[in-house]
Amino acid sequence: MGSSFGDLFRVSTFGESHGGSVGVIVEGCPPRLEIDLEKIQEELDRRRPGQSKITTPRKELDQVEILSGIANRETLGTPIAMIVRNRDQRPSDYKEMKNIFRPSHADGTYHLKYGIQAPSGGGRASARETIGRVAAGAIAKQLLQKVQNTQILAWVKRIHNIEAEIDINTIGFADIESNIVRCPNQDVAKLMIQRIEEISRDGDSCGGLIECVVRNVPAGLGMPVFDKLEADLSKALMSLPATKGFEVGSGFRGTFLKGSEHNDAFIAGDKNRLRTATNNSGGIQGGISNGEPIILRVGFKPTATIRKDQQTIDSEGKQITLASKGRHDPCVLPRAVPMVEAMVSIVLADHLLRQRGQCSLW
């Protein structure tokens, strides 16, 4: 329960942070889709731990293994199973915390719900669960690219209180990957890295904001009422670890505008295609994509695991002073960028198949 997402393009993840492996099963991917296996690995490398001085020092190769559903670099139309084996588990880091509820972790709520939790590493609540999502998202990206030349780009817009202004019309993948914090503004990126290092040296952590743009979006994706496109995007992105907020288009800033300021006037584009003069709606109106770029933002809280002393209790109610020893990111945002892209890709691939299935018979 709770480990699957999507209707037609369905993604189910499995595994724990300190178990033997983590993985994913993708169902519903159309057959005969040519798959670039290297691109799956490239996406996993982007979220891999130990990739820079501002990420967790845990060392994992995160090499993907394709178990089924792809042969000779083509999808078969059957379930695609992929796993990544865990290599650098250190359960000893958690031995002293076995019965202790770490502040703002899932330990307490998992205990309240199940009466038991994984003995080390956070179990299903660990960010290693997202390996399966990123692998599935890499396939969804290739599907969207083939059908519509759709491009999904995410980047770090804000770290703590340091924010970058980004021109979403000109930003490219190389700009995002040009530094370890994945902020396309080079000057601001340096300040962000310094801030993460300062906070980390103090044994603390920080959060921030990731922004995402989707270009060449097919019009008509999304369903009325309960399956609105932004509703599914919100569910997908808010299911990522450490997320605390979501907005699309003008978002909360739009609440300060009047209707005359916020409305996106319709204009005729090339070949008389319906366009909008502005894009406060963020490419979605009435829960359905209008063909304009989809623009969204996701807020991430500070990493819950910090080295500072914190007060908590154990399973017997005894007061404990805790200073975590596990290996964790002082800021999750640089590695969360491919996670955001993956979940957006999965949602759009699912809605693309739903749209084609319902509205393309004649």
From Swiss-Prot:
Q: This protein is called what?
A: Chorismate synthase
Q: Name one GO cellular component term.
A: cytosol
**What Gene3D superfamilies does this protein map onto?**
Chorismate synthase AroC
Question: What function does the entry list?
Answer: This reaction introduces a second double bond into the aromatic ring system.
Give the organism the record lists. Prochlorococcus marinus (strain SARG / CCMP1375 / SS120)
- Annotated FMN binding lies at 124-126, 286, 301-305, 327
Query: Gene name on record?
Result: aroC
Q: Which domain of life is it from?
A: Bacteria
Q: What is the lineage of its organism?
A: Bacteria, Bacillati, Cyanobacteriota, Cyanophyceae, Synechococcales
Summarize where NADP(+) binds, as residue positions: 47
Q: Which reaction does it catalyse?
A: 5-O-(1-carboxyvinyl)-3-phosphoshikimate = chorismate + phosphate
What cofactor does this chain's UniProt record say it requires? FMNH2
Query: What does the annotation say about its assembly with partners?
Result: Homotetramer.
Any note on cofactor binding? Answer: Reduced FMN (FMNH(2)).
Report keywords, A-Z: Amino-acid biosynthesis, Aromatic amino acid biosynthesis, FAD, Flavoprotein, FMN, Lyase, NADP
Q: Note the HAMAP family from the entry.
A: Chorismate_synth (MF_00300)
Q: What's a Pfam family in this record?
A: Chorismate_synt
Q: What is its EC number?
A: 4.2.3.5
Its pathway is: Metabolic intermediate biosynthesis; chorismate biosynthesis; chorismate from D-erythrose 4-phosphate and phosphoenolpyruvate: step 7/7
User: According to the UniProt record, what class of enzyme is this?
Assistant: lyase
